């Protein structure tokens, strides 16, 4: 077999390394991260769902003053039946809640870490030297996301495992495993539709129907659960994502939005100031042009030159990343797929040969990856991006693309010549430098969010008032120890004051930020006139990016 995975199954001996990896990862998390690490609101939201299910046995939230529930804009929504639920999928947090009941805090990261270990198990079946796989995986944002309660790595695991089963002829089982990933990430619906289209074009009817048969039960069960829980088969996220924060748009503005999405999600990596965009295009265009060579060994000199440019450019981007100290904000402008994962160079440099490879599995995987990359930017909402790290919307296919990239480099002879080896080493080094920065940022930010949470929890008052939409998700334990009142509008402020007076609450914790204000100075003055600060505020910072003021306010006699 010239490409893809080898036929032998995964033995117990081969599982030893992934098991050791999982244990070491959990020990790393225990040593350097809080028990419930919070990077941004998205994964903090999932921790809130987890806590709510653990304490109340429900994915729906109760609040003594529903008008002041910390909705965080669209992060939490009220259903037609009046119940409040998260915008995000509840299924991973619920599974994690059950694990935490059994294993305590160690259960928070168990699913992501074990998922990455399983990805390792499958990827180590790839032909060739194993260290190449390990280095390439280390140079991608997989380890970073395995240290957070987030669905990216479990979803990537289902895709990678399904691909391995698909290659081995276990098509029905592959369909079932793939569809299990639908419970994690909605992007897999797109990936599944693309795969169906490819199989139809190849007239692989038998394979397609077997895959669909395996996928039918998990997919139907998900649609049924979403309908029963949320009144919509797409769930809350799937049914509202496209309209969140999106203004009315003309055809021209929508066209510009799509073009921006392609740049944002495939290329952008703003660590070189105003030169970032020109440098990114200068790095990618030669590699993409070389990828149109009619064979792996054709245009060899041009491929090597393009590879050198790509490797040197991504090394420059990676080195410049370390000068950035705003660990959160820089993550909003550094997630272009091909710059942020330089080990995908082999995919770009050998694009056409991979698409036309004689091995049907390799060609199908390459076509699936390319079509997914080209379709997803049309579907993403640029008004609902927020802070992230790396190309998170492509995490699901990155392991498969890494396999294709290494395979392409082998076939193109990059591992035999000095120049080719240097290109591969430089791309791997660039990726590892980026991921070391990511883990450093993760340790810093999660420590800061934990400090902010502990500061609020340490104050004995049981009510928290804030106009910051992201406070509950950045401090996910607080809503279950105290009542949080959101005052992001004049109406909410009035409702909060009425609630405080109705419940005879004479003092509360006020959390503000000089950088993000939803209420005006006049509205804040109205609140502080009735409940003046009882002392100087405590100033806290998260990730050198966000400043917070925490103070106690007490009603005047």
Regions found by a protein language model. Name each.
Residues 144-155:
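Short acidic/glycine- and proline-prone juxtamembrane loop motifs at membrane-interface regions
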Residues 388, 422-478, 485:
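Membrane-embedded, lumen/periplasm-facing catalytic core of multi-pass transferases
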Residues 5, 167, 190-224, 281-298:
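Perimembrane helix-loop-helix junctions
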Residues 1, 14-22, 176, 213-216, ...:
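Signature aromatic-anchored transmembrane alpha helix within multi-pass, membrane-resident enzymes
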Residues 68-80, 230-354:
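Membrane-lumen/periplasm interface segments of multi-pass, membrane-embedded glycan/lipid transferases
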Residues 121-124, 138, 154-178, 196-198, ...:
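Specific aromatic-rich, kink-prone transmembrane helix
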Residues 98, 106-130, 156, 161, ...:
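Transmembrane-helix motifs of polytopic, lipid-linked glycan transferases
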Residues 184, 329-347, 364, 385-412:
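Hydrophobic/aromatic-rich transmembrane helices and adjacent perimembrane loops
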